[in-house]
Amino acid sequence: MKKIVTTLVALAAMLTAGAQTKTNETKMTYHKVQVEDCNVFYREAGAKDTPTILLLHGFPSNSHMFRELMPELADEFHLIAPDFPSFGQTESPDREHFTYSFDHLARIVDKFTEQIGLTRFAMYVFDYGAPIGYRLAMWHPERITAIVSQNGNMYDEGLGKKWKARRAYWQNPTDELRKQFSSAYALETIIGQYTFGTPEGSVGPDGYSLDYYYVNLPGRAEMQNDLILDYRSNVALYPEFQQYLRTHQPPLLAVWGENDPSFIPAGAEAFRRDVPNAEIHFVPSGHFALESHHTEIARLMREFLKDNVYA
């Protein structure tokens, strides 16, 4: 009997140790690393010896948008989510000494991945994070194992009605129009981005409240105004992004909030034109679909990555 009890105690200790190790590997940790003039903040979860997913946020958000998704996938994947310069906790150098363009943000993210040792990874791209991620894919196609696009557009037909006014601004970027687009930083505008088209009561206030705080820190509005104007560089690159897909045929999953007025469902459906085997899914949500459907999106990602990349 004593031997049986001893064996059971030892087994329990092993199971407890295993559970603690798993918990340590899946918990969220927070870090900063210097890249050029920026101290880049990032979140990390999952064991480093598991397949890596780089998570690239949108406007006006930051890596906080992945707070629910990362723990759901950290048991099988290594997840990294940085904040871009002028977003979240990453330092925002003065505009006189730092160019706020999508190409420069992509260069920062590129150097960031190299500094923390990422050599092969899948990407989750959303909103502003999409043209940043697509640049990385064009520059280093050998590093990209798969793309998960959540309302991350690269097609003209994916641009909603609001982009008509943006295009007019890009063609005639007056100071008056620049000031008008500062309405994007108003609290009611940000709340609308989060809640439009989502099931009632499914979006908590934490995300949009935090975004409103960060985007209205001193100097950041003008940095964001620079990016609103420079978004035209992303649209100009759409043909090159599409050529990357046709040439390299990366495994591609598009998960779209079907009620998003900014990047409409046609943008998701267009992926099959360039990647015939792309998986396309729609969820009954809006632009920030993770807020209401993170569990479903995590499930789709897990199944897609295990079936197509890490089988």
Language model features by range: what are they?
Residues 55-58, 81:
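Structural cue for short, hydrophobic secondary-structure segments
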Residues 59-69:
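The serine-hydrolase catalytic nucleophile loop
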Residues 2-8:
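Sec-dependent signal peptide recognition
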Residues 286-298:
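Catalytic histidine-centered segment of alpha/beta-hydrolase-like enzymes
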Residues 68-77, 115:
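A short, Lys/Arg-enriched amphipathic alpha-helix followed by its capping loop at the start of a domain
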Residues 60, 85-88, 154, 286-289:
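Alpha/beta-hydrolase active-site loop signature
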Residues 11-18:
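Hydrophobic h-region of N-terminal signal peptides that target proteins for export
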Residues 22-28, 34-40, 45-48, 52, ...:
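Flexible "cap/lid" subdomain of the alpha/beta-hydrolase fold that forms the substrate-access gate
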